[in-house]
Amino acid sequence: MAHRLTKEELDQQFEQFLKESVSDDSVDLGTSSKRPSVLDSLGKAPVRPVKKASASVPWWQDDDDNDDDSEEKGMSSTGRSFLKSLRKTPSIKEVDEEQPKELFLEDEGNRDHVILSRDSLEPEDSLVIPSAGARGLDTLDEDDDDARFLSNLKKVSSSSIDFSRINREQELSAPTSPLRREEMDSTIEEEQRMNKDTAASPAYSEDFEEEASDKSDVEPQEKKPERLGMLAKVSLHDSLNSTDGALAPAVPSLAVARENRPESKQTDMPALEPAVQSYGQSGGSEMEALQEAYRQISGSAGVCEDGQVEAGRTPLSLSTLQPASTVESDLPTAEELMQPIGPDSGFTRGFSLQPITEAVPRSRDNQSPLRISSDESPFSSANEGYGGGNTANLTGGEHPDSYKFTQKSISEEIRRLMQEQDTSSQEPPPLKPKKRQVPARSNASTSASSRKAPVPSVRVKKPESKPLHRVPAPSRAAQAAKPPSPPTLRKAQNQTFKKTQNLNQTHTIKGLDTSLKLSSELVESVQSFAAFLQHQVEASSLQDKGPFQANKIASEAMTAHKGMQEKMDGGPELASLERLRLQLAKKERELSLREDQLQEQHKQELTALRQENYILQSKLHRAEEASNKRKWSFGEASDPVTEEKLKLIEKEMKEQETLIQGYHQENEKLYLQMKALQAQSKQNEEALFMENQRLLTELSFARDRMNTNNIQRTIRERSIVDQSFNIAELTSQVQAAQKKEERLQEEVRRLKQEKQALHVDLEMMRKERDLAKVQAVCKSGDKGFELKLLHDKHREEVTELKKRLQWYAKNQELLDKDAARLHAATAEIQKLTEQVEKLKAEVSRRANEQQRKAKEKAGEAKRIQDLERQLKQKEELLKRRHPNSLPALILAAASTGAEEDRLDVRSLAQSSQTAALLERRVHRLEAELEGRDEAAKRSLRAMEQQYHRIKLQYEQQISDLEQRLSEKSHSYPAISSELIKSHTQTLKAELEEVKEVHQKQVSVLQAEVDSLQEQLRQAQASTQTEKPARSPSRHQLHAEAAQAARIERLTQELNSKSRSIQELTRTIERLQRERRTMLSGPSHERPNNEPKRHLGTAKDTKKPSVETFPPTQDEKDYHPGAFSGTHISEVQLENDSLRTKLEELEVLREKEKVSLQAAVTHAQNQLLRIEEQNAEQLTSVKAEHRKEIEHLLARHALEHSSSRVAELTSQLNTQEIIVQHLQGQVKELQGTKEALAVTKLREETLQNQLSKLLEELKEAKEAHSPELKHFTSLEQKIQSMEFRYSQREKQLQQVIADTRRVVEQEQQSEVERWRKLAQGRAKELEAFRMELDSILDVLRELQRQGVVIPMPEHTSTNTHTYLPLRS
């Protein structure tokens, strides 16, 4: 049992180390061996001979000893071999060239070379810490960095100094910096990849160069305390041929050679060739064919049973080793076919029925067999790191040039294999090459590998064109944890090509020997029977499986029947089967032992050469560092020149520190300026964006206006001839305007919804702001900076929201303008359409009248002439016969009646024309009324939008005022009443302005109403004056009555409109009152149902009371005196004169309307002024009246009350005033109390910070000298090392326990699997015996019948491919 340091010994050594001075004067950079230091013996045990690790005992039998050894190695010899916690430590190779490398070789005589052997489960590149013998590496790094820094400063002193870069370099070059560690880790990985001289053994450490040069030739053979990789040891005890500890003397050396010799260009297959050839040449009988069939049957059944048993299990992380193509399909890719077949992958195990995957965990069922075999080999992963030509070292001189394969030879080999595949015409090759392929079955392997040959032929080019790097061989656990890189896969493919070549050579020898032994009758019978069985198997399997599996089953059936036939021929010699198997296994073991010895010799020579090379390099580095040190040395410490130089250096360092501080402050200022400039640029960008948006909207509006102006101009320029085209264009414009109006209404609706959402967001943000204020008051004073940041952020968000609201208000204004323009355009369009209709009607009427008049004139002229002639004749007859009789008088009266009827017909036509004209006017007036209704609606909506906009502006002003008030309340505890009064006065002035605006709007509406009423009165007066002009006919009376009814209806509608306008004025006043209450009170809500109700009433009043025309329109009473002396031309003249009068009246009405509007506005302004003056006088009178009443009351109280009551009341008043004053003071004191609490909290936090800073200052003053800095850094490093050591111990214990548990589980699973496999083999043998008996019975029956079995024409191995039969 090794000696472990006790706690007392460690404490004693540590106290001695603390007593000893470790200053710069006492330590000579580790070069002097005269002064022994405590650091040399720190952590050392009492000097005892170092144990050698025994390689003959397995690791699980002496765990305790090994643990103790590892602990001894961890603590002995200056504590050099503590392993860092699973992180890559800097190797000796990448120490900077400027650092003195002689440190690592100075103290070689005083040190023991101790290595902590590690498990194979640890990462490969977790190296051993180099010793800190004379002085710590980190302190030496610091000294060298300081020296480098000063020299660089001297070099760069003339130019400008980049202090930020110097600080970064100092931080990166610090030995404890994590960035430097990561740099060193990355350089370790690169150097381990690139450096070809690095040792690959797991036990190789960084302490290698510390050994003396005279021991370099002897110690590689003496000191071999390497422990084998744990999984490598496990794999040695996998097979059934080995027992626990049976191969102890020879096998560990094999594992060591395989694991620790990456450069020895080893391969898996060539080591087997002597055994294979001796077996192929020493058979000489037909029993070999039977043994071959047994082997094939066992291999195929093992694969099938393993696939069935392990199909249900989920694959572990080892499945990531597959290429991407094999995860999804069952077909092997070229990379899988190129994987190396390890030496323990099935050839070295004899002929017993062993499983295919013997050293692989259960989770590898999803990998192809070749990949599994590549995972099994202890040094196959090491082979993957090197080039393709590394197979010829151990072949025994058979293929000395196989490692010099070029790209051309590989492609030729692939082409040859493909040609052989094409020539074999009996059955297709199997889908998956089996792992346990023996030399007689090499044809199947070549065909399987040649199937994917065109794919890797491209990839094989890469490894040979690049330099080959040597990588330390990882253990099997590390190999399972990470997938192989593409270079390693390509290099493994090269190895597989060479193995395929070796298999082909052995196959030729073996195939010729076995095939020449067959008799022709036997081969013919087996061929016929196998063809029959093949047809049966194909017919049954093609229904269940794919074509590839059917071919596979058929080929396996043929191979099995060949093996049966051979077994039948060699039946008498079944007893010697076991003897031959034992002899072959013995030969294989001898060959493997000889191979291991050769590998061990080669490894020892290589390690000796490497040690010599490394020692020479270290001597060279030591010489270089000595010369560098002579350059840097300033002489002894007592030299006055050196002291002056040191003072100058300290002075320069102080100056540089002040410069650095100045630059740091300047950098902070520049950073703040840059932030301010960024904020200003962002604001400028936002302003420019808003300006661009505004200009774009103005541009679009200007374009629309130009388009409308162009349309109007073109409409004006066109003549009446293009009326149809004008009507179509106008209708299209009307439709476009309607679409635009709908789109604008949709935008208005959407903007309203967004505005409501923004209102909700604003309320939420206000609540959040209040909560933040409350939290800020609740929190302590040291949160002031965070509160200020939050206030700034909140202010920025509020400004952004205000900008958005302003943008929405502007957008609303633009929409209102657009709606006004739209309204004007629709009015113009309506006017133009009315004009077009008028022109159409007039044109058609004139044409019809002309035609009708022409016809009537022609007909009437003829009739008149006939009637006049007849009348004259009759009158003449009557006059002649009875001049004074009654019939003559009746005839005279009838003639006059006919003339009156003719005149009545003319008057009826004229009255129908006037009725049509009046109806058109009525329709036009109704359209105007509807337009007015729509205008009233739009104006109401515009007023609502203006109200909302003004409300938004007021809310924004209120929020601004609240914010200012809160800021001033924070800055000043109390605000004077004068400021409040000024604020209220400004608010009142703004309210008065809003009142004036709304009253002006109301006055404008009232003026419009009055003008309309005046127009109606004038129209009524004109109609009344026109009535008594002449005695109208009956139809004219009816038309006038209908017109009067319509005028009355229109007046009623006008009255209803005026009532609705009055209601609207009332709603406006009510809204003003609500706004006042809203501004005075906290509630911002407004009842929205009132305007809707009034709108509904207005809509109800808009419906006119429908009145029908009088029913006497169609009656035709006889009036003999009507139109007695008038003609149609007179009626037309009267109509024209009436029309001109009507136009003149309309012009007069417009003028009077304008003048009345001006007079109304003037009167309203005067009325407003008078009302304001009256209100001011009333308020002044009220105030004077109140003062007089108070004065009278006071005087009355003084006159009519006793002096005691007056005194008491005055005292009471004074007490109340004092109480109010004291309450104000109490409120002020409460505010000051809260401020005092906040300041107390701030003071406490500042005192705590001050105490911390004083402590840090004290520590900095204590540690201002380099000795104290060195001492404190060493203390911290010792503590960190102890902590890491304890962590490492715990991790090691955990890893050992986990590996024990895993190994036990694997052993149990292996035993169970072997048991199941043996049972399956026994069942297969029974079935095989039954099939053989049936075949023998068939052959006996054929012989008894006298059937002669013919000899085959060509017997070669290429024509028959025998595969095992799947039972």
Curated annotation (Swiss-Prot):
GO terms under biological process: cilium assembly; heart looping
Subcellular localization(s) per the UniProt record: Cytoplasm, Cytoskeleton, Microtubule organizing center, Centrosome, Centriole
Organs and tissues of expression: Ubiquitously expressed during early embryonic development.
GO cellular component, one term: centriolar satellite
This protein's UniProt keywords: Cilium biogenesis/degradation, Coiled coil, Cytoplasm, Cytoskeleton, Microtubule
Primary localisation category: cytoplasm
Keyword Mitochondrion: no
Annotated region (Disordered), positions in chain: 21-118, 158-228, 251-286, 337-500, 1015-1042, 1072-1123
Keyword Heme: no
Biased composition, class Low complexity, residue ranges: 440-453
Residue ranges that the Swiss-Prot or TrEMBL entry lists as coiled coil: 573-688, 724-1081, 1126-1345
Record's compositionally biased regions (Polar residues): 366-383, 491-500, 1015-1026
Biased composition (Basic and acidic residues): 91-118, 179-196, 213-227, 410-419, 1072-1105
Traits of the deletion mutant: Cilia defects such as body curvature, hydrocephalus and left-right asymmetry. Ciliogenesis is blocked at the stage of transition zone assembly.
Biased composition, class Acidic residues, residue ranges: 61-71
Function: Required to promote assembly of the transition zone in primary cilia. Acts by specifically recognizing and binding the axonemal microtubule.
Entry similarity comment: Belongs to the CEP162 family.
Name of the protein: Centrosomal protein of 162 kDa
Highest classification ranks of the organism: Eukaryota, Metazoa, Chordata, Craniata, Vertebrata
